[in-house]
UniProtKB/Swiss-Prot annotation:
NAD(+) binds at residues 93-97, 115-118, 124. Substrate binds at residues 120, 167, 251. It is found in: Cytoplasm. Binds 1 zinc ion per subunit. Catalyzes the NAD(P)H-dependent reduction of dihydroxyacetonephosphate (DHAP or glycerone phosphate) to glycerol 1-phosphate (G1P). The G1P thus generated is used as the glycerophosphate backbone of phospholipids in the cellular membranes of Archaea. It comes from the Archaea. Its EC number is 1.1.1.261. Belongs to the glycerol-1-phosphate dehydrogenase family. The keyword DNA-binding does not apply. Its cofactor is Zn(2+). This is Glycerol-1-phosphate dehydrogenase [NAD(P)+].
């Protein structure tokens, strides 16, 4: 049996914080609610969301600092102890992922209120949490609603929007890997999920100039593409439409680096290299990332070239059951170095 779950409402516009109450009413939510935010996102939007919700609901709040299993358990404990009926995550990937898994484990719905458009977790069922063995994604449930305030997302540093493009563009190689796994391993493949995923990537490539400007229209396009990516994963019932070898490379960097770059920045560079391995137009991908201001080299990413090579050689071990262009044995050091050099990453 294949159950597809999607957000029931997506609100995308300017100054939509006040909509949180209306969304909650339409979804028949009751008190109490838990507002989850980070130290920074509390000031950016968290306090305002809290204030609006207090007009109609009993509100609890909690600060989350990192995407670890300890933080998930802390939030889950607050939900259970206070008999919280629903949660709202106000923040970036860390806050959304922790709230997603904690609410799933506690059996309550959650609303996603992204303050950046840096990765496709804003509407997907998957959460990346450290402390579960390796930092790969774990399946939970997607948000029942997404409330994206363009004014808030636009005010975030520009690199976040560029990282969002990096995460969406990785759908190109992810779908290639998925097709490969279908052909070689007989893995389930959904044409519909793949088409939606690729459409999201093609949209950001087509609109790179608009996104580069970073105005309302550019933000809107990236947010829509990220949400479509999340929906594609829900249709597939896995992260396959948006996560292939380029994500394994990013997870490898997470393990090797004390302070990794943004997820979408890493997957963007991974996509350039994996596109080269697939024999598809990696130059066009690189060009798009350059246009929007995303890093395309190890230097721009702030990572030693040696680490890039090592990440490429261990990427296949991150999730052995996920078949990709890297195959079962992965890349040799020579092949990894050659791919990174030819694409200009190192």
């Amino acid at each position: 049996m294949h159950i597809m779950e999607f957000p029931r409402e997506v609100i995308l516009g300017k100054n939509v914080i006040s909509e949180t109450v209306n969304v909650a009413k339409r979804l028949s939510f009751s008190s109490p609610v838990l507002v989850v935010y980070g130290p920074k996102t509390k000031e950016i939007a968290g306090k305002d969301v809290e204030r609006v919700l207090k007009e109609e609901f009993d509100v609890h709040s909690v600060i989350v600092k990192e995407a670890t299993i300890n933080e998930v358990e802390k939030v889950e404990g607050i939900i259970r102890d206070n008999k919280v009926k629903w949660a709202i995550a106000v923040g970036g990937g860390t806050i959304i992922d922790v709230t997603k898994l904690a609410s799933y484990r506690a059996g309550i719905p959650f609303v996603s209120f992204p303050t950046t458009a840096s990765h496709d977790g804003i509407a997907s069922a998957n959460a990346s949490i450290k402390g579960l063995g390796t930092k790969t994604s774990i399946k939970a449930r997607p948000p029942v609603a997404v409330i994206a305030d363009i004014r808030i997302i636009k005010s975030a540093p520009r690199r976040y929007l560029a990282a969002g493009v990096g995460d969406v563009i990785s759908n190109i190689t992810a779908v290639r890997d998925w097709k490969l796994a279908h052909k070689i391993k007989g893995e389930y493949f959904s044409e519909y999920a793949a088409a939606l995923s690729l459409m999201s990537a093609k949209m950001v490539m087509r609109d790179a100039e608009i996104i580069r400007i970073g105005d309302d229209e550019g933000v809107r396009k990236v947010v829509k593409a990220l949400i479509s990516s999340g929906v594609a994963m829900s249709i597939a019932g896995s992260s396959r439409p948006a996560s292939g070898a380029e994500h394994l490379f990013s997870h490898a960097l997470d393990l090797l680096l004390e302070k990794p770059a943004l997820h979408g920045e890493q997957t963007g560079i991974g996509t350039i290299i994996m596109a080269y391995l697939h024999g598809i137009n990696w130059r066009k991908i690189k060009e798009t990332l350059q246009k929007v201001g995303a890093p395309t080299t190890a230097y721009e990413l702030g990572v030693d070239p040696e680490i890039i090579i090592e990440a490429l050689t261990i990427a296949h071990t991150i999730r052995p059951e996920r078949y990709t262009i890297l195959g079962r044995d992965g890349l040799t050091r020579e092949a990894a170095e050659r791919a990174a050099k030819i694409t200009g990453v190192i």
